[in-house]
Amino acid sequence: MTLPASPPRYAVIGNPIAHSRSPQIHAMFSAQTGRPLRYERLLAPVDGFLPTVQAFRESGGLGLNVTVPFKLEAYALAEARLSERARLAGAVNTLSWRDGAWHGCNTDGVGLVNDLLRLGVALAGARVLLVGAGGAARGVLQPLAAAGCARIHIVNRTAARAAELAAAWRAAAPRTGTQVSAGALAQAAEPGGWDVAINATASSLQDAAPDLPGGLYAPDALAYDMMYGARPTAFMRQAEADGAARCADGLGMLVGQAAESFHIWHGVRPDPGPVLLALRTELLAAG
């Protein structure tokens, strides 16, 4: 009697990792597409990323989502086999085992752009304010530029970090029609206002908003926080008080980046909509 083959194995690796919704998301994608898989949380010691990945691979693992604090180590692991998105992001959140080696991609920015499009944002020609200059901000620059944004202005509490990110982007990125500039938080204002403002800081985790000036938003502008929760984040509340027509949190970005990872691994593009609705309903019920 032939035993049934085990489903392919995937995981999300991080530290901490118990909070991750990735297993739930990928289980729903699996049910939706009919692609069986085993997906789990993988807690790695802070100084033990590579041994944990090696053990996962030796047990038959085929793909990893990578979260804090290992995205730079994942980049180094796959440095010879990076997608253009990962190279420009300087970080990897998706590892795929192919042809005897790990390949790295970054799906965070695609998840953001797809969610902005879902929300009805016209990114072609848009003026975008990007708050924060860390890895989350760097990871979304290329997809925003590829979507046709006319201008991306990076602001940060430490203005020099914003300037460094803008300069690094201009040096490394392919020529696009997107103007990338930088400044301090106090230099966030723009005549006529921004079409989209994106909070790429973790300030909302402390229920705080970045120290931004008022008058930031153009008519019908969207304020988007990469963080998410059962209630509007501090950044969303700040934006609404400043006149933003619409506000959204990052739950759709989370589901969108997972959908892109699923597509990379399985060659099938799942529908994020039902999964996003299920997670939102669960969040609201818990909140």
From Swiss-Prot:
Keywords: Amino-acid biosynthesis, Aromatic amino acid biosynthesis, NADP, Oxidoreductase. Its EC number is 1.1.1.25. CDD domains: NAD_bind_Shikimate_DH. Pathway: Metabolic intermediate biosynthesis; chorismate biosynthesis; chorismate from D-erythrose 4-phosphate and phosphoenolpyruvate: step 4/7. The keyword Oxidoreductase applies. The keyword Cell wall biogenesis/degradation does not apply. This is Shikimate dehydrogenase (NADP(+)). It comes from Bordetella parapertussis (strain 12822 / ATCC BAA-587 / NCTC 13253).
